[in-house]
Amino acid sequence: MFVLNKFFTNSHYKKIVPVVLLSCATLIGCSNSNTQSESNKQTNQTNQVKQENKRNHAFAKLEKEYNAKLGIYALDTSTNQTVAYHADDRFAFASTSKSLAVGALLRQNSIEALDERITYTRKDLSNYNPITEKHVDTGMTLKELADASVRYSDSTAHNLILKKLGGPSAFEKILREMGDTVTNSERFEPELNEVNPGETHDTSTPKAIAKTLQSFTLGTVLPSEKRELLVDWMKRNTTGDKLIRAGVPKGWEVADKTGAGSYGTRNDIAIIWPPNKKPIVLSILSNHDKEDAEYDDTLIADATKIVLETLKVTNK
């Protein structure tokens, strides 16, 4: 007993007690910190679920209003936040594939090679030829065909580009080499626009087509000079004013490619530049139950507004 009393009254005890107390305080502090961290994590997860439910409800409400099915994928490259709704479901890609085919053309050819003149006859004209029908006698360069395909959705221009690539299967092979294992290309215009429910030819998913568009326009698949060409053509697209462009605030830049087909298919894929911010990648695909259904461009514009509201992207 004498030894213990001596120990607790000597300098050793005076040194040990503060250390023990500090250790206990540290453990308690860590425990509280971990508990707080876990609580914050659970709160964030709960808020995220609530936000997703609210967003999905808004998209479902649009689907009911327009009697359509929506497929959406968006990526805000400044925050890496995504918006996904039926993002892995297949939809007919229709003419949105024209931007990807031009991207593939740029990948396979030098800038100088785009000056090659391609000749064709009236028998080669497809169902929609606002530019190519004017140049049957002279032909058009690959660069001119790319411009016509992306900016005017000229179907003959698209077919000639596909032939230059080696056909739809060769185009698909290029996409596979880029890592797109989803997008299926099997036919030329105008047949590629006719896709029945359950068929997978000439289809993609909102997520896959958005990722591939991102690779061509913002990634390293193409050197900067070629990326700039594709983006410039898409920014000057003449067919998209009532779709994604109509859903973004004034002053925002949009580079897009539209598409339409059977079953009321209406699509738009785009890169969006809010002022002084990094771009947003967005794909909106849609269709209806009936083969002869008509589409409504406002559906795409309204869906765009919900996406931007979800991403909380402002005009500031």
UniProtKB/Swiss-Prot annotation:
EC number: 3.5.2.6
Annotated substrate binding sites: 257-259
Enzyme class label: hydrolase
Stretches with biased composition (Low complexity): 40-50
Annotated GO biological process: beta-lactam antibiotic catabolic process; response to antibiotic
Signal peptide range in chain numbering: 1-29
GO molecular function, one term: beta-lactamase activity
NCBIfam families: bla_Bcer_III (NF041270), bla_class_A (NF033103), classA_firm (NF012167)
Protein name, as recorded: Beta-lactamase 3
Recorded catalytic activity of this chain's protein: a beta-lactam + H2O = a substituted beta-amino acid
Gene: blaZ
Family: Belongs to the class-A beta-lactamase family.
Lipidated residue numbers (S-diacylglycerol cysteine): 30
InterPro entries per record: Beta-lactam/transpept-like, Beta-lactam_cat, Beta-lactam_class-A, Beta-lactam_class-A_AS
One GO cellular component term: plasma membrane
Active site: 95 (acyl-ester intermediate), 191 (proton acceptor)
